[in-house]
């Protein structure tokens, strides 16, 4: 990666901050902005240049990364009052790493193209640990030429980098992946409660299913660490999983694709959020079934 390149980073939360820090470790200039002053201070301490608003970041940068909570915020940051697109010079590349719908990305890409700006979707998988270690999986939607331009920068913050297609394709892959994760997690919770109701021990199911056709990433990643321990702090928040299922339903509606299993999983996670579990790991959805049935699985009981 060329050290002379100027990077902008907007959105320095749990994911954005470690990604920006990894870029700084490579010796490039990073212009940073976040509404939370503490987040900006954390990257300034690592050598970043603080900017007072989004436009200042845009005007100073060759490539601008954004990592934001949802599509509404992304669109406001890009095209609202004082937005990024009003201050970018032609030839700038914007790389949005947020989890949003392909339709939102395509809308922003169209506006950007009218100004001579390339707009890329590059959602990630790997969580905060992957962001800190620089080992994220990155799913990129962009033209071949733009992908080649940004790939050296992406390689600093990610390990497995996939050019999956044109603009919007990265968001689509992320949505499909998280649809499967959500449905698998809801099914796992349901199955474990049934097993305990039938007299099985959680440990027995974990061992046997883990070696059988019913095994899944949801079981491998969530069973021992969260469900068996009964500690659901940290991890991938239920609120975020619920949001991603909503994005899948939105894409299905736009494409006339029925998604009945996704709709049901969404309602199950909604039940968990109604119980106040939104900030716990998504595997806390098992508490919905425990409450309905009077069966205890979590905590190895």
From Swiss-Prot:
Record text on subunit structure and interactions: Homotetramer.
Instruction: Enumerate the GO terms in the molecular function aspect.
Output: 2-hydroxymethylglutarate dehydrogenase activity; NAD binding; NADP binding
- One short Pfam name that applies is NAD_binding_2
> What are the alphabetically sorted keywords of the record?
NAD, Oxidoreductase
- What InterPro entries does its record include? 3-OH-isobutyrate_DH-rel_CS, 6-PGluconate_DH-like_C_sf, 6PGD_dom2, 6PGDH_NADP-bd, HIBADH-like_NADP-bd, HIBADH-related, NAD(P)-bd_dom_sf
- The protein in question is named 2-(hydroxymethyl)glutarate dehydrogenase
Query: Which pathway does the protein contribute to?
Result: Cofactor degradation; nicotinate degradation; propanoate and pyruvate from 6-hydroxynicotinate: step 3/8
Q: Record's superkingdom?
A: Bacteria
Annotated binding of NAD(+), by residue: 8-22, 99, 243
Q: What is the purpose of this protein?
A: Catalyzes the conversion of 2-formylglutarate to (S)-2-hydroxymethylglutarate. Has very low activity with (S)-3-hydroxyisobutyrate.
Highest lineage ranks of the organism?
Answer: Bacteria, Bacillati, Bacillota, Clostridia, Eubacteriales
Q: SUPFAM superfamilies annotated for this entry?
A: 6-phosphogluconate dehydrogenase C-terminal domain-like (SSF48179), NAD(P)-binding Rossmann-fold domains (SSF51735)
Q: Which Gene Ontology terms describe the biological processes this protein takes part in?
A: nicotinate catabolic process
Q: Which family does it belong to?
A: Belongs to the HIBADH-related family.
* Oxidoreductase found in the keyword field: yes
Q: Which Enzyme Commission number(s) are listed?
A: 1.1.1.291
Q: What catalytic activity is recorded? A: (S)-2-hydroxymethylglutarate + NAD(+) = 2-formylglutarate + NADH + H(+)
* Catalytic residues (positions): 174
């Amino acid at each position: 990666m060329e050290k002379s390149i100027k990077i902008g980073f907007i959105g320095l939360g749990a994911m954005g901050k470690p990604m920006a820090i990894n870029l700084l470790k490579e010796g490039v200039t990073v212009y940073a902005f976040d509404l939370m002053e503490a987040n900006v201070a954390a990257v300034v301490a690592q050598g970043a240049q603080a900017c007072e608003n989004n436009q200042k970041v845009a005007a100073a940068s060759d490539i601008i990364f954004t990592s934001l909570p949802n599509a509404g915020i992304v669109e406001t940051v890009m095209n609202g009052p004082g937005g990024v697109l009003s201050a970018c010079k032609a030839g700038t590349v914007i790389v949005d790493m947020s989890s949003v719908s392909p339709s939102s990305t395509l809308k922003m890409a169209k506006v950007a193209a009218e100004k001579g700006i390339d707009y890329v979707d590059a959602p990630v998988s790997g969580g905060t640990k992957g962001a800190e270690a620089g080992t994220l999986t990155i799913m990129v939607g962009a033209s071949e030429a733009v992908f080649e331009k940004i790939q050296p920068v992406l390689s600093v913050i990610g390990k497995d980098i996939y050019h999956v297609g044109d603009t919007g394709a990265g968001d689509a892959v992320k949505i499909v992946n998280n649809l499967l994760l959500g449905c698998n997690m809801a099914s796992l919770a349901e199955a474990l409660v049934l097993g305990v109701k039938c007299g099985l021990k959680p440990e027995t199911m974990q061992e046997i299913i883990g070696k059988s056709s019913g095994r899944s990433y949801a079981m491998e990643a969530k069973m021992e660490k969260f469900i068996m321990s009964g500690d659901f702090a940290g991890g991938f928040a239920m609120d975020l999983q619920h949001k991603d299922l909503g994005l899948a339903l939105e894409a299905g509606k736009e494409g006339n694709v029925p998604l009945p299993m996704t709709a049901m999983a969404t309602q199950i996670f909604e039940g968990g959020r109604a119980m106040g579990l939104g900030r716990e790991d998504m595997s806390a959805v098992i508490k919905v079934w425990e409450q309905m049935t009077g069966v205890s699985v979590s905590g190895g009981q």
